[in-house]
Amino acid sequence: MQFAVRILKFADGLPNRPSGRTVANQVARSGTSVAANYRAALRAQSRADFINKITTVLEEADETAFWIELTELANLLPAKRLAALHTEAEELTKIFNATRMTARNHKS
């Protein structure tokens, strides 16, 4: 949930011009989706359901990292303001990938 809050604050800080608004909308959507879909994954009805939902979480975390990278490449914000958030998005991507792999390999 805290990642989603940080993403919303990041989105609010983007420039109010077409490129900034585009990135703000996309990163807010994908970044908050990480938290919402993770919550749904925790309530999965089966292992297959959990794997499907955690895959969505993984994809949204990776997409969020993409939008943060694009923000830097497009010079919408200084790189030093993005470093911690980008690192967190990458770490979450790795965590959710490992979670998915464990769930896939777990024998019931």
Regions found by a protein language model. Name each.
Residues 1-108:
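Short, C-terminally biased terminal segments at protein or domain edges
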